[in-house]
Amino acid sequence: MSANNNMESEIKEIESISFGMMSSEDIRQMSSFEVKTAKISSTNLLETVHDPKSGPIGSAPCETCHQNEWDCPGHFGHIELNVPIIHPLFINHVVNILKIFCWKCNEFLLTKDHLELNNILKLEKEKKFNAVLEKIKKCDRCVHCTTPRADYKLVLNDITYKTIYRTFSYQGGAVKTARDKKLNESREIVSAEMVKKIFDNIKLEYVEMLGISHPKDFCLEVFPVIPSCCRPHEVQDGNINDDDLTYQLMEIVKNNSMIGAIKLEKESMEKQYPECLKVKEILLLSNVEKQKKEIDDFLKKPIKNGLKTKKKINKEEITPLDQYLKLHDKYVKYVNNLKFRIETYCNNSQGKATHATTGRAIKGLRERLTGKEGQIRNNLLGKRCEMSARTVIGPDPTLKIDEVIVPKEIAQSLTFPDFVNKHNIDRLTKLVNSGNAIRLVKKNESGQEIKINLAAAINNHGTPLQHDDIIKRPKITNNHEEKHNYEEKHNFDTFETIVIKDPKNFVLKEGDILFRNNFQQKVVLPSKKFIKLEEGWIVHRYLQNGDILVLNRQPTLHKASMMALRVKIMDVKTFKFNLACTKPYNADFDGDEMNAHAPQSEESKAELFTLSTPKQCIMSCQSGKPNLTIVQDSLTGAYLMSKENNNDATLTNGEFNDILMVLTQNDEYNGDVVDYFLKRKEDVSNTLKKLGFSGTVLNGKGLLSLLFPNDLYINEEDLKINRGVIYDGCLTKKYLSSTESSLIKILYKEYGVETCATFLNNIQFLTNRWLMISSFSIHAGDCIKQKEVLGTVEQCLMESEKIKMTTQNPFIREQKIMQTLSNAKDVGMKIAKDALKRDNVNLHAQNNFLTTVESGSKGDHLNIAQITSLLGQQITEGQRVKPLLSNGKRTLPHYILKEENNDTEHFHDLLEEYESQGFISSSFAQGLNPKEFFFHCMAGRQGVCDTAMSTATSGYIMRRNVKLTEDIKVAYDGTVQDTRGRRFQMAYGELGYDPSKLVKVNGKPEVCNIARLVNKLNCNFEDNIK
């Protein structure tokens, strides 16, 4: 007990985390074992990568902490490297640090005074270091020893490892001495030993002044070995395979051991042949060209002690000098291999390291931690759950906003635990015995839970049949039910003989006699057992109509990305829901998939029904505008219906009642639905007569008026409603979408959630049914190009030519030309818009392109201009397309190379000149030629790239924000605090208002619009007096 108490008392709260490099001593102190050999035997695993001190192997306890595999956290080991290695992840930092220190005296190239004069020391850590790097570039020599400054570059050699090269150069190219000239022409390799020597001599005061940690730890002398639990072996086809990291560690140990053995052999030769020391000095030269030259000179000189005499070494006739050089080549090879293995152990994102047998790329530490499939996002931040499903989504205009169609396959996979009580015991008993439940849970006398598989408990499959069993069945005339299950059938007295070829699908019947190997067998017919439930048992039943299901589309950015919908089971393959719910999900039906989650308790169902149904998500909690809106077909239908004249009867009485019938299936009205609409129809007719109309309701406006409350008043320029009756204006996106003046918001705020939800359902049912009578489509006649456009293009091009001749400054000239050419698109848009409206008036026909734009259901006037007029100037990187071919004289090879001063006399030549820089005079209806298509793709490509980049950036920011604020909540006292009780706000948003319940009055958020409520009361009072 005392040990446990001591352990508990030592546990403290983490205050901060710091990241940095571990020194060699830190790694040794942390290590529980040293890996010395790559050879593994079944009897001895000590000092290998599978050392028992790294953690338990199988059922054996850990030899370090003596815990089992569940409790042991794992223990690090280490490898003593026989040669220092620059840490591959920090090699760029190493190069930058080398640049600011002298390569000869290892002092800082500048003085502290230099930094103080330029106010560099006052900067933050990273900014300070970058400023020092920029300052060093202007320095030629070390201020301490006057040695020329060296420049360092990182070069990738043989696509496997990186090498640091050192060169000497001077600002302005001035060479001062013979030594300087010699250095200036050299290019040296900087080895890890040289880097370590420089870093070891760097004074601590310089490190503190620069605000960095000491760089000596960037040179690895000891390599850590992660615990075995972090690199578990995997079993495939009965074979045990080592993890990728274990494979890499074994390769590191192999190469390290070979380096150690070669070093010992070289030292032995240096003792035996002292002249080898001279060769060693030459081989250590960092200048490759100088090294080759001195080796050649050394080989030409006469050498004593038999260094050039051939001897039998390792069964090979070779001179000791050649053997020594051969050992050096092997040494360099294994050092490079060691660098490569350590680099790919840390980061193998480019797939350089592969398995020798399979060729599969090895997963390094970086790949395991970072990215979508890494440990952090996939495991630590990942959300995994049972009772969920995923499939493609689609629309269904017959559904209400709070309903979802679920495929039958999914409904028979997801379950809900129902507790048996006196109120539901009969219903659940029927479900269990009809095969609509999967599992039964009850408790025995000792209180232990017993799980019963209902399929096995209810169904008795009878005698198991085998292939070639013989069944004798009483002969039944004209019964071919089992004909497909047997191949041989012979009449035998009053029986028919059946040879079973498909035992799984054959069903025994009463009177069957079974023979197996000429012996009669006992026949037990298939039967079902009746299960009687008791109170307190738990029935895991399949989903049923009316159940709650949470539907989610990723990315989940706000509350309404997960909404609770009521289930309707159908024999389909996709989820289907109402189109009004597409906006909060940001969903479309071009192949999008969504997730469904089945709640597993009555409490969670109640919480979802109270907080997360579409009715509770109608208004956005961020902007206060409607989340659920009328879109596309329904919006077009509402616009066309409200555009009809109040005095015209465009529908027969039968058609009117037929359309009205779709509303009577709605059970959300109080009282008799039919009586409600008959009374409402009479009220609408009376209101129209008072307003000076004929009083007919047999048109679109009359139908729509039935949906509004009888005390709704709207008095806008483009829409007027009196006592819930539309008598002027049209319903457009402004009034049925996500705007401040939306009717959805007004109904939600003034009449409540239920009235608003009923309106959203009914207006979609009504408009969709009306469109079945009054069809709507777009045809080729709506896309005719206007003749006036050609004159506009010519006028804009001529203006551009005038600007080109009169403006001298090239920058100003280009900006004016761009503005003039962009005007062509605006003028084309105006021409298209006016022409379409003019055609509507003259021909008394509706251009359906214009209808979709004016209603707001799809597109805008710019889209119409692009289809019927011209696309205009294409912009890439904020300017016209640059001529990059033929020394900057043309943009594409399709255009003829012309002289710079060549004047264009004809319009065709002028058009081609501007077309070559991205001006498109064609429309989509006319079609783009190949050259125009190139330019159009150039402009579109930039938008695609920007979208992809911004999506990744915003997603990363969102993940960080969610993680940082995941425990912040509004407490019961109204304050905003986290789980530790730290308060961030005394009231949410400083005011404590819910944005979804506010309205904007003159641009300011208010609890309610007093002027509107007063006007409503006055209108009601005046109508009652009349």
From Swiss-Prot:
Keywords: DNA-directed RNA polymerase, Magnesium, Metal-binding, Nucleotidyltransferase, Transcription, Transferase, Zinc. It catalyses: RNA(n) + a ribonucleoside 5'-triphosphate = RNA(n+1) + diphosphate. InterPro entries: DNA-dir_RpoC_beta_prime, RNA_pol_asu, RNA_pol_N, RNA_pol_Rpb1_1, RNA_pol_Rpb1_3, RNA_pol_Rpb1_3_sf, RNA_pol_Rpb1_4, RNA_pol_Rpb1_5. Zn(2+) 1 binds at residues 62, 65, 72, 75. Mg(2+) binds at residues 588, 590, 592. It holds the Pfam family RNA_pol_Rpb1_4. GO terms for molecular function: DNA binding; DNA-directed RNA polymerase activity; metal ion binding. GO terms for biological process: DNA-templated transcription. Zn(2+) 2 binds at residues 102, 105, 142. Component of the DNA-dependent RNA polymerase that catalyzes the transcription of DNA into RNA using the four ribonucleoside triphosphates as substrates. Largest and catalytic component of RNA polymerase II which synthesizes mRNA precursors and many functional non-coding RNAs. Forms the polymerase active center together with the second largest subunit. Belongs to the RNA polymerase beta' chain family. This is Probable DNA-directed RNA polymerase II subunit RPB1 homolog. It comes from Invertebrate iridescent virus 6 (IIV-6). The lineage of its organism: Viruses, Varidnaviria, Bamfordvirae, Nucleocytoviricota, Megaviricetes.
